[in-house]
Amino acid sequence: MSRIDYSVWDHIEVSDDEDVSHPNIDTPSLFRWRHQARVERMEDFKKKGDDLNKGLQECRRKLAEAQKKVRELSISAAGDAKAELTKTQTEEKKLKKEERDWARKLEEHNHEEKKMPWNVDTLSKDGFSKSIVNVKADSAEDTEEEKEKKHKTFVERYEKQIKHFGMLHRWDDSQRYLSDNPDLVCEETANYLVIMCIDLEVEEKHALMEQVAHQTIVMQFILELAKSLKVDPRGCFRQFFEKIKTADQQYQDAFNDELESFKERVRGRAKIRIEKAMKEYEEEERQKRLGPGGLDPVEVYESLPPEMQKCFDEKDIQMLQDVITKMDPTEAKAHMKRCIDSGLWVPNSKMDESDEKEDGSTYEEVKQEQEEPAKKE
């Protein structure tokens, strides 16, 4: 089975300021991975049932063959037939036990299926293969610009209420608040809550993130339920709360599984954003360090021979002159040029007066500085 493609999250940008505009947010795509995960679990459950049924049928086929063979051997009185009969009867006994095991597992699976909690994919079934009803035609999908404008306008108007809803804990409180503020039951609220979760995780406010994540899943369930029933979300949110408040432990566990999976995705997205921000910061710092020749002094320093690194560590020019003298001239010139281009070594004013000097001038300069004291002696 192919893995879920989570790349739909890549376009969600975590704001680092007070800008409430988050362009190009597509809630159906954003939550599609949750729906896909649930569908895959349902498919896995169905496949398990099919495998159990196939196993039971295969076991029964082998048992029927063994029983037939036992009847045939029972008619024969030959010595060899008696030995084979004993062996076949043992096999028959083994297959009967396996049949009971397969049947028990299949019965448990079927019982588990009946206890499975409802979701937006199983809540409603087709009652008729065809219906003739006058329905409102689907409106044209909003453009990206329209989505951005709609989201920005909504957040500007309801940001305070959305944040309040995100901090609620009890089912009754959430239902009551949505009853008082039905306009919050929409995709724009879900958009804001998701981004709010990622922002909080980036800021390392983990407890708050988990609280808002809970309310995000609540809103997601309501929106998916409305989509399945083809009704306005504002008209079915009470139905969700009635179910969740009276659900058995298994249904509550299913809700919690959805919540935990969502929080893991939030942590993953936050980690990616933090790593991206760190890389951008490191690149900015690197650009600030670049020398006149466009090289990074840190990278150049790390590429130098240990003996040259020691010269720069101790800021000892005499030591550097000695090291340069002992090195191969070509290698020394190359190292000194990189040192200048990165700003590790700053030539004297004489060297800056002419741009036409060769790259080896720096090497000659260091060498000359070493020879001049010797001449004076």
Swiss-Prot record:
It is found in: Cytoplasm. Residues 353-362 have a biased composition (Acidic residues). Residues 364-377 have a biased composition (Basic and acidic residues). SUPFAM superfamilies: Hsp90 co-chaperone CDC37. The keyword Protein transport does not apply. Keywords: Chaperone, Cytoplasm. Residues 339-377 are annotated as: Disordered. It comes from the Eukaryota. One of its GO terms (cellular component) is cytoplasm. The keyword Chaperone applies. GO terms for molecular function: heat shock protein binding; protein kinase binding; protein-folding chaperone binding; unfolded protein binding. One of its GO terms (biological process) is protein folding. InterPro entries: Cdc37 (IPR004918), Cdc37_C (IPR013873), Cdc37_Hsp90-bd (IPR013874), Cdc37_Hsp90-bd_sf (IPR038189), Cdc37_N_dom (IPR013855). Its main location: cytoplasm. Co-chaperone that binds to numerous kinases and promotes their interaction with the Hsp90 complex, resulting in stabilization and promotion of their activity. Belongs to the CDC37 family. Forms a complex with Hsp90. This is Hsp90 co-chaperone Cdc37. It comes from Dichotomyctere fluviatilis. The gene is cdc37.
